[in-house]
């Protein structure tokens, strides 16, 4: 059975033994956790990651001394969310004195520290040695980036990450670096003899010790970053999804990968959830009885049209709730005993501007039952 098949199967599991939710259905515990330094927010594209990460950052600003919201998503939606332009330098968000935002590019940079000593030999040989490690250039850039972030003096950093596939690649970089740099270190003695021989025949000055000092530094840095990732007291991941198949599927894939990499994850935010409406359903037969009592033909036609449209809207609403309930049930059965599952309502308009983000952030603190649709029949 393929990984995709096994994941698909896991999404159809139902638990007959499921009783009460043991975990709160809000993010209060996450926000009150004073030991966390890094909070990653991720999921499929278009599920509300940026809105969720911005809201978490706003709430943390009420509880922590200094907060940085850091976007690693190439789309950089944080500027649009706050209606404020951000750059690759921390910028204070309007109306705050302790909440900053920056938008960075995690792709390869010419400034990565692995551009060690400019020698023709080094520049030609080292890339050849690393060809067996695809993505190493991005990994090196990521290591430099994470080391810089680690040295920043913020109480907590909230990462608004790119869609799932890109995020999983980033999370794999520390292990990739560990393998690649370990490979170079293991070649030290062989390289030393080769370089000394080359030096005796050429005028190239190859500072081997300086090169390996840099390699050892990068290796120590990657180990430190991986250690930070795997420390549940310092780092956690918040998964964001919507109650649709592809989103739930990617959430399961993300959680499995996080588990393999020993990265803490115990919060799931489910956005765009249609909650029950506090209004009576349309009783068509009752309406038809009322219709017969109306003598005015125009009023009768208008009333009939209104009843029909109302019934159509109700059918759409019920269909939507039934479809969402299928995936909400799967989310509840798969994660209800181990995760804080927070259902956020489908809203009338997009979340933009500080006021709307603040209002949305308050809803992250409210406990709400997972709204599974149950027909009265």
From Swiss-Prot:
Enzyme Commission number(s): 3.6.-.-
GO terms classed as biological process: tail-anchored membrane protein insertion into ER membrane
Gene3D superfamilies: P-loop containing nucleotide triphosphate hydrolases
Location in or out of the cell: Cytoplasm; Endoplasmic reticulum
Broad class of the protein's primary localization: cytoplasm
UniProt keyword annotations, A-Z: ATP-binding, Cytoplasm, Endoplasmic reticulum, Hydrolase, Nucleotide-binding, Transport
Active site per database record: 73
Principal EC category: hydrolase
An MF annotation (GO) of this entry: ATP binding
Binding, ATP: 44-51, 244, 271
GO cellular component, one term: GET complex
Cited Pfam families: ArsA_ATPase
Record-stated family: Belongs to the arsA ATPase family.
Oligomeric form and interacting partners: Homodimer.
Function: ATPase required for the post-translational delivery of tail-anchored (TA) proteins to the endoplasmic reticulum. Recognizes and selectively binds the transmembrane domain of TA proteins in the cytosol. This complex then targets to the endoplasmic reticulum by membrane-bound receptors, where the tail-anchored protein is released for insertion. This process is regulated by ATP binding and hydrolysis. ATP binding drives the homodimer towards the closed dimer state, facilitating recognition of newly synthesized TA membrane proteins. ATP hydrolysis is required for insertion.
NCBIfam families for the chain: GET3_arsA_TRC40
The name this protein goes by in its record: ATPase ASNA1 homolog
Organism: Plasmodium knowlesi (strain H)
């Amino acid at each position: 059975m393929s990984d995709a098949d096994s994941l698909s199967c896991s999404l159809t599991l139902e638990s007959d033994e499921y009783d009460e939710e043991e975990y709160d259905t809000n993010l209060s515990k996450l926000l009150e956790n004073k030991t966390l330094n890094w909070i990653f927010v991720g999921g499929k594209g278009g599920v509300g990651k940026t809105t969720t990460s911005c809201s978490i950052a706003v709430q943390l600003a009420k509880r922590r001394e200094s907060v940085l919201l850091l976007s690693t998503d190439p789309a950089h939606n944080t500027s649009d969310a706050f209606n404020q332009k951000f750059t690759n330098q921390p910028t204070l968000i309007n109306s705050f004195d302790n909440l900053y935002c920056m938008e960075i590019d995690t792709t390869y940079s010419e400034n990565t520290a692995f551009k060690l000593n400019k020698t023709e030999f080094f520049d030609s040989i080292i890339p050849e040695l690393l060809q067996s490690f695809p993505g190493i250039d991005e990994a090196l850039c990521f290591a430099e980036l994470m080391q810089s972030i680690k040295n920043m003096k913020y109480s907590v950093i909230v990462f608004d990450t790119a869609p799932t596939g890109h995020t999983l690649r980033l999370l794999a970089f520390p292990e990739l670096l560990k393998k690649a740099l370990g490979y170079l270190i293991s070649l030290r003695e062989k390289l030393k003899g080769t370089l000394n021989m080359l030096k005796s025949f050429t005028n190239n000055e190859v500072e081997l010790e300086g090169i390996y000092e840099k390699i050892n530094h990068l290796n120590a840095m990657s180990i430190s970053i991986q250690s930070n990732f795997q420390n549940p007291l310092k780092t956690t991941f918040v998964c964001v999804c919507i109650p649709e198949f592809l989103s739930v599927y990617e959430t399961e894939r993300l959680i499995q990968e996080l588990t393999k990499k020993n990265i803490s994850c115990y919060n799931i935010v489910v956005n765009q959830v249609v909650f029950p409406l506090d209004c009576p359903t349309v009783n068509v037969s009752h309406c038809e009885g009322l219709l017969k009592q109306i003598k005015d033909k125009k009023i009768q036609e208008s009333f009939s049209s209104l009843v029909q449209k109302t019934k159509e809207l109700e059918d759409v609403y019920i269909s939507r709730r039934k479809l969402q309930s299928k995936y909400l049930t799967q989310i509840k059965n798969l994660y209800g005993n181990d995760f804080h599952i927070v259902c956020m309502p489908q809203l009338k308009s997009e979340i933009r501007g500080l006021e709307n983000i603040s209002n949305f952030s308050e809803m992250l603190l409210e406990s709400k039952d997972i709204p599974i649709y149950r027909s009265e029949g």
